[in-house]
Amino acid sequence: MALRPAKIDRYVDKPAYTRREYIRGAPGPKITIFDMGNPAGDFEFEVSLHTAEPVQIRQNALEAARQQVNRYLQKNVGRSNYHFKIRVYPFQVLRENPMATGRKADRYGNGMRRPFGKPIGLAARLKKDQKILSIRVNRQHLKFAIEGARRAAMKFPCKCYYRIYDKEGNDVTTKILSQSL
């Protein structure tokens, strides 16, 4: 069965569906690596990507963003000069009621009889202004971290924005962007 468009699953309009002990055939997570780069490193800045609206992000989009950002940072910054962390986990089980189509579909399809649906994937459920991912770097690699966050935002079905924090956790976005990188 083909992958449905992300716009179908992005809205947070249904109750949470996460209890795996009650769900038969729930798929496993596609994203398995959440920390990349050098987690023990001491870095000056953290670039975090936030959501601008409540949204569900499918695990396919999270994995695509993870691969894109990690590859970009490894190529331009080097493996030991950054720490990249995915901050959300796909708990929400997505389901679909498969509808029969084609010739004589009415003979073998069930239509809306027992329409609860079968599990087809997982999604992370996020609130407004929640962090999706964080990239910790030093000042000389800050522009690569910002570009990585921008590339990750393209993979998600919502509006995103980034913030730059210093070591103490203070928001220094306007201060840094007013200076030249």
From Swiss-Prot:
The keyword rRNA-binding does not apply. Part of the 50S ribosomal subunit. The lineage of its organism: Archaea, Methanobacteriati, Methanobacteriota, Thermococci, Thermococcales. It comes from Pyrococcus furiosus (strain ATCC 43587 / DSM 3638 / JCM 8422 / Vc1). NCBIfam families: PRK04199.1-2 (NF003237), PRK04199.1-4 (NF003239). The gene is rpl10e. Keywords: Ribonucleoprotein, Ribosomal protein. One of its GO terms (cellular component) is ribonucleoprotein complex. Pfam families: Ribosomal_L16. This is Large ribosomal subunit protein uL16. InterPro entries: Ribosomal_uL16, Ribosomal_uL16_arc, Ribosomal_uL16_CS_euk_arc, Ribosomal_uL16_dom, Ribosomal_uL16_euk_arch, Ribosomal_uL16_sf. One of its GO terms (biological process) is translation. Belongs to the universal ribosomal protein uL16 family. One of its GO terms (molecular function) is structural constituent of ribosome. It comes from the Archaea. PROSITE patterns: RIBOSOMAL_L10E (PS01257).
